[in-house]
């Protein structure tokens, strides 16, 4: 009985504070994000241009993924219920922010028909971006 109490006494059920979440990001030197795009669905008749478009699309997808990590996502949802039955359930996700200082880590072809682009941001750039974002929120609220 005493052993169970000692073990359970070491674990906190309290949610993590914002400061502890920020420390998780600060412990690594950089954050990374990878974007993907399929070559075959790119809008061009020329194979070389489809590859270039896939690289461009996967780079934009990687930027979106970086923005999600830096600024988070806004989720809007709506559920319609009639006669205690769900008639419609819809949600939308939106990411908004400015990313600068991203470094290209790699451009890799995958399985012959997909490109993966990996970008990274140094932790100091992440701090700067978040600070600028918070300042813009305060300015807009005033």
Where are these regions (language model features)?
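Sec-dependent bacterial lipoprotein signal peptides
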Residues: 1-10
């Amino acid at each position: 009985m005493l052993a169970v109490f000692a073990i359970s006494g070491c674990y906190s059920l309290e949610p993590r504070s914002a400061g502890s979440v920020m420390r998780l990001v600060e412990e690594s030197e950089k954050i990374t994000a990878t974007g993907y795009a399929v070559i075959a669905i790119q809008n061009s008749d020329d194979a070389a241009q489809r590859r270039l478009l896939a690289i461009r699309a996967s780079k934009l997808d990687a930027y979106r993924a970086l923005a999600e990590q830096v600024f988070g996502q806004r989720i809007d949802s709506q559920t319609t219920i009639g006669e205690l039955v769900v008639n419609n359930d819809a949600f939308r996700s939106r990411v908004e922010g400015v990313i600068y200082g991203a470094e290209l880590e790699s451009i890799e072809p995958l399985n012959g028909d997909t490109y993966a682009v990996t970008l990274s941001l140094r932790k100091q750039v992440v701090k700067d971006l978040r600070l600028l974002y918070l300042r813009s929120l305060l300015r807009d609220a005033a």
